[in-house]
Structures are given as structure tokens and as C-alpha cells.
Amino acid sequence: MTPHIESKKEDIAEVVLMPGDPLRAKYIAEKFLTDYKLVNKIRNMFGYTGYYKGKRVTVFASGMGIPSIGIYSYELYKFYDVKKIIRIGTSGSFNKNIKVLDVVLSEGAYCKSYFDQLFDGNDINFIKSSSSLNKTIKKTAEKENIPLKFGKTITSDVFDLYSSSKEKFKDNYPEDDYLAVEMEAFGLFYLANRLGKEAACLMTVVDSVYDDKSLTSEEREQSLDQMITLALDAAII
């Protein structure tokens, strides 16, 4: 037990899927896992452990933003001996080559947060995800005929849709081709790197400044299910 997780150590699997939304964690457990049980409900940050294709896996919500995922991923890595975390979620994009419903795998995250400085005194703006875990995810996507966009992404402290000027928002970042914008990956990758663990981030793009496509609830669910299945299949390899 930690200040934020009530689970016993044996309740948590070595591999964790981490959606931001607690209700998405519940949805994944109910739809994809067998013999699952609720292992955390503190602050309604739901965690479930069950079996997928006979392999044990935990689905544990992170909440939104680096501070929240920083707490949960650190405690899972440090106190529960979790080896791998695959973040799964949604993202936006201001890349002309990325369309709504594209699935993006982050090669690494650029961020202007002070998380690294406050955690252990470092001052970096970019950190890579785990190459071995990415390799597994890419091979799984190829096997399942899921088109995957692989490249650098941005982790922001501001929800980009609420930025007063999207062009100014974009100008805050380097000119490199960043595929997607989300709010958690940098913190997850940083902690995995410092603690000698593995981390990856899969995202389904749900909004873009270059694509006005409006998703129906059915389209959103189906696209997320594809990403969830990809993450689960990669997690059990």
C-alpha cells in the first residue's frame, strides 16, 4: 500500500496498461479481461488485474497530466515491481500528415515542464520511450495490419484546444515534425528511464487543426478498441 494505491503487492501484474480515464480502465477490464478484480479505488482511480489470453495484466488509470501519471507510475514501478507500462489514450495533432483516427506510437516526448528538475535536478526537454517495448508494439501492429505512425510527440501542460491561439501554441515547440500532442508521456518516460523500467505510449488521434472530422461515439469506441487490443497483445509478449 502507498499513499495513493491500496493494492497489495501481489495484486499488481508486472505489465500495466495505463489509460488516463478511470472509466476507460473499467471498460477495458469488463470488455477484454477475464477473471478480473478491482485492485484500487482510492480517489476513484480504478485499477484492475485480470487475464488476457491467459496472461496476467493490470489496467490502472493515471488521471490527467504529468503530476498525476508521475505519482501512479512511480509508485507502481518503485513499490509494486512493475516492469512495463504502456500508456494508452487520445491525443490531438497539428501535423498535416496526421489524420483523425490515426494511431500514434511515441518515439519520445518533448516537454517544457519542470518535472525533471523538481524530481531529481535534471534539465532536459526531450526523453525517449523504451526502444525494446516500441519494437514489440510495432511488430504486433504489423502482424495485426494496424497502420502505426511512429515518431516524436509533445507533452503539454495545457490542453491544446483551450489555447487562445493554436499557432502560438505550435510556436512554443521546435520545428521538428511532432506527430501528436498529449499531456502525460514525458513524465512516464522520464520515470521509466530513471528507475530502469520500460514505458511506451500509444495514442489515437481524436482532433487535429487540419482535419475537421467529427467522430461519432461508435467511431470513437471502435478506434480506441483497436488501440487497446494492440496494446494488450503487445503487453503479453
Where are these regions (language model features)?
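Metabolite-binding pocket within alpha/beta catalytic cores that recognizes anionic/polar moieties
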Residues: 1-127, 131-136
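Glycine-rich beta-alpha junction loops
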Residues: 22, 92, 154-159, 187, ...
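Flexible, glycine/charged-enriched surface loops at secondary-structure junctions
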Residues: 35-41, 145-152, 237
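Short, basic, glycine/proline-bearing loop/turn elements
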Residues: 55-62, 169-177
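Active-site rim beta-loop-alpha module in soluble metabolic enzymes
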Residues: 124-175
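Generic non-transmembrane alpha-helical segments
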Residues: 136-144, 191, 230-237
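Zn-dependent metallopeptidase/amidohydrolase metal-coordination segment
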Residues: 186-219
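His/Asp/Glu-rich mid-to-C-terminal helical/loop segments that flank catalytic regions of hydrolases
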Residues: 209-237
